[in-house]
Amino acid sequence: MKAFLLSLATLLACIVLTESAPHSADVREEAFDALVRSYLQAVQRDSHMENLTCAECQGVTERNCTLGERQVQCNPGEVCTTLEAFNLDTGTTTVTRGCFNITGLNCGDNPGCGALNTTGNIQSCDQFCCNTSLCNAGTLTTVTPQTTDGNTTTEAPTSTEPPTNASTEAPTSTEPPTNASTEAPTSTEPPTNASTEAPTTTEAPTTTEAPTTTEAPTTTETPTTTETPTTTAAPTTTETPTTTAAPTTTPAPTTTPAPTTPFFCNATLAGLSGTFTSPNFQLITQTG
């Protein structure tokens, strides 16, 4: 029992000593802060003899900050600095340049980062310091405007030439009708029966009123052939076609009633009775 109590007391003593001793991480952080402060003090000592000229601006990006940049005269002992703070709320990086009396590199110790972090949304904050005039000024490189050469593609309107071809080709299609009109008079040489058809061709010129093309009037030469109809006295012979009544002799096939003999169907009918529609045959039903 005594051994157990002694072990417990020893354990408690070790816990107290461990908790009271400073952690190694804290020791390293304090050493780093001290090193940073000594470096900044050295920078301030080197620059206190002159007033630096620094760039001053603020923007959501480095380019926006550089576009609104202006030169300012710093107070004695101040250096040129650049702060880059990431705003977690808006998802943007705020870039600030100007003159600051820097006391530390952490956002909590730096007055510039502290001023930006009034809302508490700054996730990270980095700062850069230098001790020469305009050492924190930004630069812009704008080479992209050379892409304006693409506007030379305005030559495309030259494609308006094809429509002129379509308009000139259409009138050429009016020439074939003149050939058709010249062929009709050649048909007057056959029998006078064909001459009766020629007057019917005079109806075709009436269709020439629809086309607006001026070439259609060239068909007016065909009416000059109307002098040939003076031979229309011959059409009195057109009565001869009445001889076409001769085909009325076609009833000769009526001699087919010869097969008056009954026609027997050797197959069994599907029904009890039937009707055969042919006038030349009789349907005889067989039972059994």
Curated annotation (Swiss-Prot):
Transmembrane segments: none
CC terms in the record's Gene Ontology section: extracellular region
Alphabetized UniProt keyword annotations: Secreted, Signal
Residues annotated as signal peptide: 1-20
Signal among keywords: yes
Organs and tissues of expression: Component of the acid-insoluble and acid-soluble organic matrix of the aragonitic skeleton (at protein level).
Cellular compartment(s): Secreted
Annotated CDD domains: TFP_LU_ECD_TRP (cd23582)
Ranges annotated as biased composition (Low complexity): 151-253
Polar residues bias: start-end ranges: 141-150
Domain of life: Eukaryota
Keyword set includes Translocase: no
Principal subcellular localisation of the protein: secreted
Start and end residues of each stretch annotated as Disordered: 141-260
Protein name according to UniProt: Threonine-rich protein
Lineage, top ranks: Eukaryota, Metazoa, Cnidaria, Anthozoa, Hexacorallia
